[in-house]
Amino acid sequence: MHNKNNTILQTIKGEKTSHTPVWFMRQAGRSQPEYRKLKEKYSLFDITHQPELCAYVTQLPVDNYNTDAAVLYKDIMTPLKPIGVDVDIKSGIGPVISNPIKSVSDVDKLTQIDPKRDVPYVLETIQLLTQEKLNVPLIGFTGAPFTLASYMIEGGPSKNYNYTKAMMYGDEATWFALMNHLVQVSIDYVVAQVEAGAELIQIFDSWVGALNVQDYRYYIKPSMDKLINGIKAKYDVPVIMFGVGASHLINEWNDLAIDVLGLDWRTSISSATKMGVNKTLQGNLDPSLLLAPWDVIEQRVREILDEGMERGKHIFNLGHGVFPEVQPDTLKRVTQFVHDYTSK
């Protein structure tokens, strides 16, 4: 295959690149008209279970927007069903779990994952994409143990994580048993994605910002160390860490054996650099800005790129996922602008 665009991998290695790489969290699906047409007929689980469809949705933004990476279209809940979690995606709510974890005996009932047997459709999608179709690296992903555990304990999305924190503080045996279980599930799931052809992995710890630094260090960080070191022990694949509203944890993340630290829109690249972050930085346009007039978007994107170019080792992205209301043409223009502005 000729001229594969490996800008994102080169950036992570600290090599000189022709431009700043760009991709968008939730770029696959969401606002694309082709995707919306599919969603009239199929649910999220329907699409992810059909490799041809899933590969099509994953590739759309690369073809339409010219992004420098593809990100697998699937949900962080994907590995939970096979281990015994009764999860359903309810429209307008998100994942709903009818058998929440309440005790250590509930954790004991969970099984481990065998990705080839349990999620072959995920691996087949990756194989379809990476064999000749894509000219950019494919990002695989997993939810982090805390975020997966919070869904499993709360029974769905939560605003304050009361049940999760109650278990953490009040029943450490169950908490750490669940974390250890999810670490192993996540390692096996990620390693299978890499073996199928994923060239980067993003770990989404979407909700971990709900914890303070002290609790993160004690209840979460050991599991994150195990997870990342477990992946790296098998493959030297770049790992991106991302969570929302977690700027107080940036130094904790910087200690982990990750390669890229994803910033949400609240923390600038220059302030993360001043805090001593030495990883590649990813981000961090406020996704709501994509609904603003173009001159405002361009100005904000330029500010982020200026900070990124001054620092080096920067991947342009949003500070969270694309909203469904965003016009596909806006994402195309942003990608083009990033490429043009940084290649001068």
From Swiss-Prot:
Physiological role: Catalyzes the decarboxylation of four acetate groups of uroporphyrinogen-III to yield coproporphyrinogen-III.
UniProt keyword Protein biosynthesis, yes or no: no
Taxonomic superkingdom: Bacteria
EC number: 4.1.1.37
Protein name: Uroporphyrinogen decarboxylase
Functional pathway: Porphyrin-containing compound metabolism; protoporphyrin-IX biosynthesis; coproporphyrinogen-III from 5-aminolevulinate: step 4/4
Record's keyword terms, sorted: Cytoplasm, Decarboxylase, Lyase, Porphyrin biosynthesis
Biological processes, Gene Ontology terms: protoporphyrinogen IX biosynthetic process
Binding site for substrate: R26, Q27, A28, G29, R30, F45, D75, Y151, S206, H320
Reaction equation(s) it catalyzes: uroporphyrinogen III + 4 H(+) = coproporphyrinogen III + 4 CO2
Subcellular location: Cytoplasm
Lineage of producing organism: Bacteria, Bacillati, Bacillota, Bacilli, Bacillales
